[in-house]
Amino acid sequence: MSRRHKAEKREINPDPKFGDLVITKFMNAVMLHGKKSVAESIVYGALDAIEAKAKSEPVALFHQALDNVAPHIEVRSRRVGGATYQVPVDVRPERRQALAIRWLINAARGRNETTMVDRLSGELLDAANNRGSAVKKREDTHRMAEANRAFSHYRW
């Protein structure tokens, strides 16, 4: 892996319905096999379902869910003298957002509702209320970091 140049971030256009960059990133993560229109209908369908169920602003609820799932600290492996330590490190804001999006989508795919729209809306509502698999994943990550706090002086 070359260390000479830093990879430039690609420009992402905001989504057409809400004008939100994060929703576009979320849509791109939901997308499978390049089928953007399918991903768009899933995400917009889930946000419409949230609006119907919660009777509140779906974009605000979406951002609340992302904030509740985003980890603040995680563990990274570090080899020191033949032993591998799990060292707790702070999570950069871009990675925090990417992990939150990934965990929400994986948790939604693991649910047992019939359609992806129902699964995604259910997981987003659960995450906004600090419940669900994605929030549990964040809590497990934080618990791991807390358990390995003794190795925090190995931070790099």
From Swiss-Prot:
Disulfide bridge positions per record: none
UniProt xrefs under SUPFAM superfamilies: Ribosomal protein S7
Residues in coiled coil: none
GO CC field: small ribosomal subunit
Keyword tRNA-binding: yes
Keywords annotated in UniProt: Ribonucleoprotein, Ribosomal protein, RNA-binding, rRNA-binding, tRNA-binding
One GO MF term attached to the UniProt entry: tRNA binding
BP terms from Gene Ontology: translation
A Pfam match: Ribosomal_S7
PROSITE patterns: RIBOSOMAL_S7 (PS00052)
Keyword Transferase in annotation: no
NCBIfam families referenced in this protein's UniProt entry, alphabetically: rpsG_bact
Physiological role: One of the primary rRNA binding proteins, it binds directly to 16S rRNA where it nucleates assembly of the head domain of the 30S subunit. Is located at the subunit interface close to the decoding center, probably blocks exit of the E-site tRNA.
Subunit details: Part of the 30S ribosomal subunit. Contacts proteins S9 and S11.
Family assignment from sequence similarity: Belongs to the universal ribosomal protein uS7 family.
Listed HAMAP family: Ribosomal_uS7_B
Protein name: Small ribosomal subunit protein uS7
Organism from which the protein derives: Brucella canis (strain ATCC 23365 / NCTC 10854 / RM-666)
